[in-house]
């Protein structure tokens, strides 16, 4: 699902809200979450999951074009851990 599909879906469920208002709310929510993660905070949304930062240690990579070894510095990367309710809901889907 893309952001525009999410906006369409929410606009269908909440006809009293304009798609523009929904888009602004989604952008604001994503902005707040991004700022919190950039500040090192953990975000927990009960029933959905949590976002946190994980440390990735430095390593030696390889340039795929030249085959040359390249030193990659350590970095923090966003990590999502799904909550129990989300895991259960996804696992209940029949293939």
Swiss-Prot record:
UniProt xrefs under Gene3D superfamilies: IHF-like DNA-binding proteins (4.10.520.10)
Region called Disordered, residue ranges: 52-95
Pfam families given in the database record: Bac_DNA_binding (PF00216)
Keyword terms: DNA recombination, DNA-binding, Transcription, Transcription regulation, Translation regulation
Compositional bias ranges of the Basic and acidic residues kind: 82-95
Domain of life: Bacteria
GO CC annotations, alphabetized: chromosome; cytosol
Stored PROSITE patterns: HISTONE_LIKE (PS00045)
GO molecular function: DNA binding; structural constituent of chromatin
GO process terms (BP): DNA recombination; regulation of DNA-templated transcription; regulation of translation
Quaternary data: Heterodimer of an alpha and a beta chain.
Function (record text): This protein is one of the two subunits of integration host factor, a specific DNA-binding protein that functions in genetic recombination as well as in transcriptional and translational control.
Name this polypeptide is given: Integration host factor subunit beta
Taxon lineage: Bacteria, Pseudomonadati, Pseudomonadota, Gammaproteobacteria, Methylococcales
